[in-house]
C-alpha cells in the first residue's frame, strides 16, 4: 500500500469514528445563532428563506413572508414569540432551536411578532 492510500484510509477512519461518536455533526443547530440573534426559517430543517432578528431591533412585527410562516428557528437570545389576536405567547431561551416548529405547536403558523427578553415584558398589544 502506498502512502497516498494509507493517508486516505487513516483520514476516512478518523471521519467515520468522529461521526459515529457525534463529535462531528453537519446539523446547523450545532453552530447556533450568535448571541443576541434569532434565525427564523420559512421551511422545516432550517431551510428556505431566513430572517435574522437582532434583539437591538426591539419589538418586531414579522414581515408578510414570515407572519404565520415560521417553520423552524435557532435562537441565540431570550425572546418572546407573540400572536396578538387573541393573544398567545411563547418564551424562547438562548440556545433553543426547533427544526419543525410549525408542526410541534402549530404556533409558527400563527406567530405575528418577536419581543426581546421575557414574555412578562408584554403590557398591551400594539395599535
Swiss-Prot record:
A Gene Ontology cellular-component term: extracellular region
Glycosylation sites: 54, 118
Covalent S-S links between cysteines: none
GO biological process, one term: sporulation resulting in formation of a cellular spore
Subcellular location: Secreted
Major site of localization recorded for this protein: secreted
Swiss-Prot/TrEMBL keywords: Glycoprotein, Secreted, Signal, Sporulation
Region forming the signal peptide: 1-25
Superkingdom of source: Eukaryota
Family: Belongs to the Dictyostelium gerABC family.
Annotated protein name in UniProt: Spore germination protein 2
Organism lineage string: Eukaryota, Amoebozoa, Evosea, Eumycetozoa, Dictyostelia
Amino acid at each position: 500500500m502506498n502512502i497516498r492510500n494509507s493517508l486516505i484510509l487513516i483520514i476516512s477512519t478518523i471521519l467515520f469514528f468522529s461521526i459515529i461518536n457525534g463529535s462531528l455533526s453537519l446539523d446547523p443547530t450545532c453552530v447556533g445563532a450568535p448571541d443576541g440573534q434569532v434565525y427564523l426559517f420559512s421551511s422545516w430543517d432550517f431551510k428556505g428563506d431566513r430572517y435574522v432578528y437582532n434583539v437591538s431591533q426591539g419589538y418586531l412585527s414579522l414581515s408578510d413572508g414570515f407572519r404565520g410562516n415560521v417553520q423552524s428557528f435557532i435562537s441565540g437570545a431570550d425572546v418572546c414569540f407573540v400572536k396578538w389576536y387573541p393573544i398567545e405567547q411563547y418564551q424562547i431561551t438562548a440556545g433553543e432551536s426547533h427544526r419543525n416548529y410549525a408542526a410541534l405547536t402549530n404556533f409558527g403558523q400563527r406567530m405575528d411578532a418577536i419581543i426581546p427578553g421575557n414574555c412578562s415584558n408584554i403590557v398591551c398589544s400594539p395599535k
